[in-house]
Amino acid sequence: TSVAAAAKARSIFGPDARIMIDTYLSWDGPVTLEMSKRLAEFNIYWFEDVLTPDNLSGQAALRQPVKPTLISGGEHEFTHHGFAAIAKAGALDLWQPDITWCGGITAGRRILDIAREHSIPVAPHRGGEVWGLHLIVASDCMELAEKNPGNRGAPRDELWFGEPVVENSYIQPNDAPGFGVTLNEALL
């Protein structure tokens, strides 16, 4: 359960670690409110993707009742125009655009401009991949870089040479040209 997982994470990482819960669109409003109460003792930093991305008013309505936990999301929004609508609706406390899905670095910078205008923090979805990492280090994004090496059955770790690795919970992009990686052409 989410409660058991949060308890285990808190016991392993201690009182100061940020614990985030990604519900992947599986909660509704009442479940989010109930889980907020059940998880309160674990000081959850954010609930990610609690509702479907088009339910902006529902997300906005959850922000205050679940405080201090943040309502985050945005990986399923694919344009800066969509993030402008999220801002107008006051739907999310924290934005998580996915640079590979929202139009790349240029679109990501447009999204950051909108976020800055509304004082909304940004932590890119899959920010630990080279594209997200470069946006993080070249902007005022939060210094949080989600990295899931070797999961989902995808050969991502073999696709690129020079991909940064996590060391002691930190990740640094390398300083090679471009994004700092080279395509493994043997996989083509």
Q: What spans do the regions from the language model cover?
A:
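Short, intrinsically disordered, charge-balanced linker/junction segments flanking boundaries
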Residues: 186-188
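Shared catalytic-loop signature of beta/alpha-barrel
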Residues: 37, 43, 54-170, 174-177
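Metal-dependent enolase-superfamily TIM-barrel catalytic cores that perform enediolate-based chemistry
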Residues: 1-66
